[in-house]
Structures are given as C-alpha cells and as structure tokens.
Regions:
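Conserved NTP-donor binding/palm subdomain of two-metal-ion nucleotidyltransferases/polymerases, i.e.
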Residues: 1-120, 126-280
Length: 280
C-alpha cells in the first residue's frame, strides 16, 4: 500500500505514528522535503501533534519554528475551548438540559499531550430538537448568537461572545441513504445518555458517553467525512489513540454490536486497516 503515498506523506505518517506513542524521532530522512511534510500536516491540522516527536530532531530552524508556533497557538486555543466546554455544559445543566461533549477536549484526553490536539469549535450532543432549541435560547441570554443560516440537518450552530462556534447536535450524524440505519441511529442516541463515564482532561472532569458508544460516534463521524465532508488524517489519529488506551472487553463488545447492527462493520475494518498500515 505504501506506493499510494509519496515520500513526504509517508514521512508525515511516520512522525505521527511516533508522536501518538509519545516517542521521539531520532533521525530525519535526508531524501525528504520537510517543508513539504509540514505543509501537508498544516492542511490536515495536525502540525501541533508533531511537536514532541520532533523536539530533539535536527529539523531546519525555519521549519521547526513553524511547528513550535503552531504548537503554542494550539495549546492556547485548547485551554480556551476547555473553559468554554465547561461553561456551556454547566450552564445547560443548571437549566435542566443534559449535554454530552463530543470530540474536542474529550477526545484530546487520549493523546500523550492532550493540549496539542487541534480543535476549533465545541460539539455537544443533546437529547432532541426541543432541548436543542431551549439550549439556544438559554445561551442567547448569556450573549451567544445563533447563526442566521443553519446548513446542517443534524446540528444547530451558535457563536460564543468571543466568536467560537458551538455545534448543538440533535442527532449523531447527518441522515444516511438507508432508512433502516437512520432509525437505528435515532434509537441508539438515547443510550448515549444512559451509558456514561467520567474523563479528566487537562484538569477538568467531564461526563462523556461510555467507551463503546464513544468509539461508535468516532466511526460515524469518520463515515460522515468520508462520504460528504472531506477526510483528514486527524480523524485517523483519533482512532489510533482511542484504541491504544485501555478499553474493557465489555465496551469492545458494545462497539462490535453497534457496528454490526448499524451495517458499518466493513467501514470500521477498513479504517482500522489503514491506521495499522500507515500509523502503526
């Protein structure tokens, strides 16, 4: 499969593989254009993840400065989002609305350095459209602004006073072409609120959905991007670090049941094989 990628793409995968395992690159490849490697990383929004792996390498100073600056920006943004996540979730809970953190800081918790996983917005899962509309009203009273044009069928968007997007998800993903799959996902969504676990990320504790359901959401998110929204390697990085952590046999069985019943087992196998081939 390696012939499908050029040497710079392969080198990016090698560095990411080391970074995701908290290992350092000891030797650079003299045949690789590292400016191009970083440009590819930038296009996939994973430059900051490379920082620990390259910290002791002999990367040219101008290229290293790009990585260093991007890492600094990402850490700052990560803490801004962390505080916003906590504020929004607590505000909604105080008003009787349960919200589950999707992706973002919750996913970052699995990385060796959580602060280096780049994210640009806040994603929350709510129980239904009625609660989502209520949440929008509550947030508007706190200075948040609802987007005038709502382009998605599965979430509503508002903006914080400091211009960070909040996506309030009314469903796990955009509807697929299969009515059977869509009905299954609608029923499955209810379980996200009854199967929970606490996760501490960057010093803040959140109530996330249980691992089996969380993995299934990551897969659905990948499938959505694969079919409709453009696919980046950061999605694969999330998949790698999730399964690299300790997941109980019971949660693995839950995940397997969900992918079998939803008809997404083949896609899960394909994504996992790609990760094994290119990200170790």
């Amino acid at each position: 499969m390696e012939q499908l990628l050029n040497k710079e793409q392969l080198e990016l995968c090698r560095i990411l593989s080391m970074a995701l395992r908290n290992k350092k690159i000891e030797k650079l490849n003299p045949d690789v254009d590292y400016a191009r490697v970083i440009a590819i990383a930038e296009s996939h929004k994973v430059t900051s993840l490379l920082y620990p792996a390259l910290a002791e390498s002999e990367l040219p100073e101008n290229i290293w400065n790009t990585v260093d600056q991007k890492a600094d920006q990402t850490v700052r943004q990560s803490y801004r989002l962390l505080m916003l996540d906590r504020y929004v979730i607590n505000t909604l809970q105080e008003n009787g609305i349960d919200a589950i953190l999707l992706k973002g800081c919750g996913t970052a918790a699995w990385y060796p350095v959580p602060e280096l996983r780049k994210s640009g917005d806040v994603d929350l899962l709510l129980k239904n459209e009625a609660e989502t509309l209520k949440a929008l009203q509550i947030l508007s009273e706190k200075g948040f602004t609802k987007e005038k044009e709502q382009l998605s069928q599965h979430h509503m968007v508002c903006e914080s006073p400091d211009h960070i997007e909040i996506e309030l998800h009314t469903a796990l993903t955009e509807p697929f072409d299969s009515d059977k799959t869509n009905q299954f996902l609608m029923e499955c969504q209810k379980a996200y609120f009854t199967h929970r676990r606490e996760v501490n990320t960057m010093g803040v504790t959140f109530q996330l959905t249980a691992d089996g359901y969380h993995a299934f959401y990551l897969l659905l998110h990948m499938l959505h991007h694969y079919l409709r929204a453009g696919f980046g390697i950061k999605l694969l990085c999330d998949w790698v670090v999730f399964w690299a952590k300790q997941v109980s046999d019971g949660e693995k069985e839950t995940f397997l049941r969900l992918v079998r019943e939803s008809g997404t087992l083949g896609f899960a196998q394909m994504m996992t094989k790609v990760c094994v081939c290119y990200l170790g």
